[in-house]
């Protein structure tokens, strides 16, 4: 039963958030801050089983304090909504609508592993890990794991039944076997396949989705393999980049002398040689041929005008 002090009429600006199943979600403002209210749809509000599920989710959330997990603050009676969990508002999108680089995807996946490792250490199995239950903030691609409505612990026996989402639920969950952390590891493999498909993580995806006895035993083992393959891949890229740079430098050392030699060889090319030869011939043709002994030049000189010129001048004077 919710105490009188926990009743609240101070929320405003209610904005419904689309939600499947038996829950209702609403964004609302109080004290200048946005919150998320999570309650039950009207047909389920008087059902003790569903009321217990909501209380169980609150008890789990209030016990978790992790930067990559949504924070719950209280459970209050909200007009028109009934009993609700009051949670932080996350300004972002779900992973199913996210797109980014491979490096960003790797950072997101590592944050997810940290969050799941934390809840597993507290003996909590999420049981519904999927892209729509992983929020990515607009500011900094910060991961927030949400929706612990199907989560299970050793302290709660209410969910010893099939739970999960097709495409992400493990085979053993489908046949209603008891949940353990390897169910979440199967789902993590499906998520990894969505955001980082192919090499170098193909083997990790395959092992996550293998029969339960062949999967990673825990998140630590999975993370160690992920980091090893990531670092190995980065080292391979660096080696390729260094080799390419070395080839460029080597090509420069080899090609520079050849280009320099080619510039020098321009002066002795046949065409240049013929042009130079023709210039010399033209210059020689302008010079008078040397006279032999006793020969007189047929060309008039500047100091000695020809006899024809002298006769013409005399005629003009007369």
Where do the model's predicted regions map?
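Short beta-strand micro-motifs within the conserved protein kinase catalytic domain, predominantly
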Residues: 71-83
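A conserved short helix/loop substructure at the end of the activation segment
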Residues: 209-221
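Catalytic-loop of the protein kinase fold
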Residues: 120-136
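AlphaC helix of the eukaryotic protein kinase fold
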Residues: 44-63
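Conserved activation segment of eukaryotic-like protein kinases, specifically the C-terminal portion
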Residues: 159-172
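Conserved short submotifs of the Hanks-type protein kinase catalytic core
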Residues: 80-93
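Activation segment signature within eukaryotic-like protein kinase domains
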Residues: 108-109
């Amino acid at each position: 039963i919710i105490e009188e002090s926990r009743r609240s009429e101070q929320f405003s600006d209610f904005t419904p958030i689309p939600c499947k199943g038996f829950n209702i979600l609403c964004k609302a403002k109080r004290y200048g801050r946005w919150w998320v209210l999570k309650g039950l749809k009207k047909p389920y509000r008087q059902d003790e089983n569903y009321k217990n599920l909501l209380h169980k989710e609150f008890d789990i959330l209030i016990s978790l304090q992790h930067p990559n997990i949504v924070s719950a603050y209280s459970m209050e009676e909200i007009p028109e909504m009934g009993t609700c969990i009051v949670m932080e508002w996350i300004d972002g999108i779900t992973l199913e609508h996210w797109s980014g680089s491979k490096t960003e995807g790797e950072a997101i996946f590592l944050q997810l592993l940290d969050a799941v490792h934390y809840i597993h250490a507290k003996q909590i199995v999420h049981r519904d890990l999927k892209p729509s239950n992983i929020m990515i903030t607009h500011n900094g691609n910060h991961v927030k794991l949400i929706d612990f409505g199907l989560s299970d612990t050793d302290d709660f026996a209410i969910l010893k039944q099939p739970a999960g989402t097709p495409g992400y639920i493990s085979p053993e969950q489908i046949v209603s076997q008891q949940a353990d952390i390897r169910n979440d590891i199967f789902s993590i493999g499906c998520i990894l396949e969505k955001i980082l498909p192919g090499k170098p993580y193909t083997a990790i995806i395959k092992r996550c989705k293998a029969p339960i006895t062949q999967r990673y035993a825990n998140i630590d083992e999975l993370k160690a393999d992920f980091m090893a393959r990531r670092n190995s891949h980065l080292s391979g890229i660096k080696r390729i980049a260094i080799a390419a740079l070395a080839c460029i430098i080597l090509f420069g050392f080899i090609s520079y002398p050849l280009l320099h030699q080619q510039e020098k060889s321009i002066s002795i090319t046949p065409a240049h040689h013929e042009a130079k030869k023709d210039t010399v011939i033209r210059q020689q043709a302008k010079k008078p041929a040397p006279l032999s002994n006793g020969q007189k030049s047929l060309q008039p000189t500047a100091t000695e005008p020809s006899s024809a010129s002298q006769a013409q001048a005399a005629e003009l004077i007369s």
